[in-house]
Amino acid sequence: MKPNNPTGKLMKPAYLENVLEVCKEKNIYVVLDECFIEFCEKENSIVQKLSTYRNLLIVRAFTKIYAIPGVRLGYLMCSDKELLQKIRGQLPEWNLSVFAEAAGIACLQQQEYLKKTV
């Protein structure tokens, strides 16, 4: 997890990059949970490394920063298009409720809330 819950501790970038390199060499996927990344004071995401590491998958959720527990709404980022197609093929037909979709749209319109929260 990056940052860790409940401590908020972040992995050192050099350590994380080393893990990514070793896993890349061994053809191992790395799933990085960044659901709490918006609470960090400065940019600490590794999202800019997606194009370098096709084995990197980043998971984020709306539920943490927008304080909407129970609303199952999140997303995954990955640069491996073939893998994304495989993942999409495993999703249920109705993987997003109408309520969660409406909540997500409303959240994306609340930039002022984000500034106040962080």
Indicate where each model-derived feature is located.
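Active-site pre-lysine segment of PLP-dependent enzymes
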Residues: 6-65
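PLP-dependent aminotransferase class I/II
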Residues: 55-118
